[in-house]
A protein has these predicted regions:
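Positively charged n-region of N-terminal signal peptides that target proteins for export
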Residues: 1-5
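Bacterial N-terminal signal peptides
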Residues: 8-19
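N-terminal signal peptide c-region/cleavage motif recognized by signal peptidases
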Residues: 21-23
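Hydrophobic small-molecule pocket/channel-lining residues, especially in calycin-type beta-barrels
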Residues: 25-194
Length: 194
């Protein structure tokens, strides 16, 4: 038997078995995700809705105040939560726009947090707390920005500190938002099959 035939036969058998197994596996998957994912998202339901208030950002260039909005809702049958934040200048121009997806990884038993903002994207540690959440993002060598949010009684208060090893935390951003209503985003408006 030639070496080519020895290599081709197992590869062909693998390809056939993969083609046969894939439709069966696909039928077993729940398009709404798992119950564990939905349960993890339910613990964050306090985030849902439309929010508006202020964001104060401290930078080397000075202090900037924006009108900040957030809209939050679930998708994929409640198995993920999506967040869009926008910061508006006094003239109404969008100065900041971010989008995030919060999920639950059953293998690690931890939340996942993937964000897009200002031309960057990344996966960052995210932890639900009793009355909010916390997360952090790298901010250069030996530094992070650590965010802590408290959401209760219709108020979303989030503070971010720039933390460099061996130095005291510096205030970077503070958001103070009020819940202004419910939102059917992003689930509403799906394209119908006909």
């Amino acid at each position: 038997m030639s070496i080519t035939r020895l290599l081709v036969l197992p590869l062909a058998a693998f390809a056939i078995s993969a083609a046969v197994l894939t439709p069966a596996q696909a039928r077993q998957q729940d398009p709404a995700g798992s119950q564990a994912q939905r349960d993890a998202m339910a613990r964050l339901a306090f985030m849902d809705g439309e929010w508006r208030g202020t964001a104060v950002i401290n930078s080397p260039e000075g202090r900037t105040t924006l009108t900040q909005t957030e809209r939050v809702g679930t998708h994929l049958g409640g198995s993920i939560r999506v967040v869009e934040g926008r910061g508006y200048a006094a003239d109404g121009a969008t100065r900041f726009n971010a989008f995030a997806i919060i999920g639950w990884d059953e293998r690690t038993q931890a939340y996942t947090f993937h964000t897009y903002a200002q031309g960057y994207q990344g996966d960052y540690p995210f932890e639900a707390t009793e009355d909010g959440f916390r997360w952090r993002t790298p901010a250069g060598p030996g530094a992070t920005i650590q965010y802590v949010a408290t959401i209760k009684d219709g108020r979303w208060h989030e503070v971010g500190h720039y933390v460099r090893e061996g130095q005291p935390p510096l205030p970077y951003i503070e958001m103070d938002l009020r819940r202004v209503g419910d939102s059917d985003w992003p689930g509403a408006g799906a394209v119908s099959p006909e």
